[in-house]
Amino acid sequence: MEPKENGSELGQKIIDGPTNPMVTPLLNDLYQFTMAYAYWKAGKHNERSVFDLYFRKNPFGGEYTVFAGLEECVKFLANFKLTDEEIDFVQECLPGSEEAFCDYLRGLDCSDVEVYAIPEGSVVFPKVPLMRVEGPVGVVQLLETPFLNLVNFASLVATNAARHRFVAGKSKSLLEFGARRAQGPDGAISASKYCYLGGFDATSNVAAGKLFGIPLRGTHSHAYVSSFMSTDEIVDKVLRSADGKTTCEDFVSHVQTWLKKIQYSPSLSGIFSETNQSELAAFTSYALAFPKTFLALVDTYDVMKSGIPNFCAVALALNDFGYKALGIRLDSGDLAYLSREARNFFCTVERELKVPGFGKMVVTASNDLNEETIDALNKQGHEVDAFGIGTYLVTCYSQAALGCVFKLVEINNQPRIKLSEDVTKVSIPCKKRSYRLYGKEGYPLVDIMTGENEPPPKVGERLLCRHPFNESKRAYVVPQRVEELLKCYWRGSADEAREVLPPLKEIRDRCIKQLENMRPDHMRRLNPTPYKVSVSAKLYDFIHFLWLNEAPVGELQ
């Protein structure tokens, strides 16, 4: 694609392609191409259409969702182009299609498409359009499946991450450890990115760290510990001090000396007797490799009788040479109990052996954690500083999909509606504007949709907000602040300014700030208060006029 199409003539930065090279125009459902052909055959392919991308219900039994995936959608738009090879394949899939349709596909791009969206990382709610896509119906129809694919999982896993952050609390570190359990390579990469967006602090996924600049965290597994048989396997025993001024020629012996001191300590001697020496060898070896970031997995054999004492011996030896060990990881057992016992042990070492700060060692917990287990740990009382969460986080174990939809709401300036016996599936017609209204305490009160040409809500002026389908649900609101939600992120080749795609860190900061600004009763895990989504009185009347106009009238005989 030429730079003037991808970046505009305003000198805006050229937009790279999607992170995953599999995201091409062929990442589509077949019926998008059959409809494109039918539109083209009927001469309707250039008719101006408006589609809304939205969801109908918040995930995980909650009352909020985090919007994610917008950046990847814009990258897809900016680089939308079918190759000759792809066009040949589409032709094979549509037997009997005319050759001229291939010429049409060959000329397709998104230079006549406009996309308005809520900023990525925003807290969003059902029915309100996350994205409004305008353009020739033949092109926009080919954006539906890719956009839904890019937004559905991204928003789901970002919301899952935000919920884990909420239950863990602001003070805890959250580490995403899900690569090995994710649904394939893209599931792993996407989950790492959007878990970070949703409030996690770091990932173990090296590829995601490289691609997105996410902080990396990780130490060692049980395999490393059990691979050692004794300290005799440690060949290089030399440790240079942190300041570089001294050298310990036999760090192994220094560790063993500290272990004996711990064993003979009056307050600690009753907890353990002999520790596992192969584990001690593994810890010592790892500390020699990473003296500045030593953190040990202590549950390979026995946490309190071996893992913790062995860790302390190595950490105390490192301390003598100017290094501060980071802490431990617990991957099994009663995490609440073991974390408390470990903390007590560390505090006793600090007190008995006069080592300032030793009691503040970081305790990391893993082992199939999820919202429920973290909530249970909180209720039991624990001393965990960081949670490593994998399977339940990245797979969104408690809900498989978000359920975003992409619905036509206007074509050739004519509003359209999708009806259903299930009222939750009735679409809200016409090209709309969306606003968030804030109350006196600074919290959002309601999101309201209006017709495109309606005057916007004004601060201090009373406004009637109506439920889109339930006539008895209505309320007056006097907003103290009004925020328009949809902003332009793509104007095709038009020489007009558009929103700049912010870096991931800024999107993450936005997400955290928005979540903090929500009313607490909307955020709680159990029985959260639903957030109000409404339409203006004028739009309400129009929805029901169009509904009656389009619904067939039955006849009784």
Curated annotation (Swiss-Prot):
Textual note on the cofactor: Activity is highest with Mn(2+).
Induction: Up-regulated in the quinolinate synthase mutant old5 causing increased NAD steady state levels.
Protein residues bound to 5-phospho-alpha-D-ribose 1-diphosphate: T391
Swiss-Prot/TrEMBL GO biological process terms: NAD biosynthetic process
EC number of the protein: 6.3.4.21
One GO molecular-function entry: glycosyltransferase activity
Transmembrane stretches, start-end: none
Keyword Ribonucleoprotein in record: no
Recorded catalytic activity of this chain's protein: nicotinate + 5-phospho-alpha-D-ribose 1-diphosphate + ATP + H2O = nicotinate beta-D-ribonucleotide + ADP + phosphate + diphosphate
Family matches, as InterPro entries: Aldolase_TIM (IPR013785), N/Namide_PRibTrfase (IPR041525), NAPRTase_C (IPR041619), NAPRTase_N (IPR040727), Nic_PRibTrfase-Fam (IPR007229), Nic_PRibTrfase_pncB (IPR006405), Nicotinate_pribotase-like_C (IPR036068)
Residue numbers bearing the Phosphohistidine modification: H222
Binding site for nicotinate: Y31, T219, R329
Post-translational modification remark: Transiently phosphorylated on a His residue during the reaction cycle. Phosphorylation strongly increases the affinity for substrates and increases the rate of nicotinate D-ribonucleotide production. Dephosphorylation regenerates the low-affinity form of the enzyme, leading to product release.
Pfam family of the protein (one): NAPRTase_N
Record keywords: Glycosyltransferase, Ligase, Magnesium, Manganese, Metal-binding, Phosphoprotein, Pyridine nucleotide biosynthesis, Transferase
Cofactors: Mg(2+); Mn(2+)
Family affiliation: Belongs to the NAPRTase family.
NCBIfam families named in the record: NAPRTase_put
Its job: Catalyzes the first step in the biosynthesis of NAD from nicotinic acid, the ATP-dependent synthesis of beta-nicotinate D-ribonucleotide from nicotinate and 5-phospho-D-ribose 1-phosphate. Helps prevent cellular oxidative stress via its role in NAD biosynthesis.
Name of protein: Nicotinate phosphoribosyltransferase 2
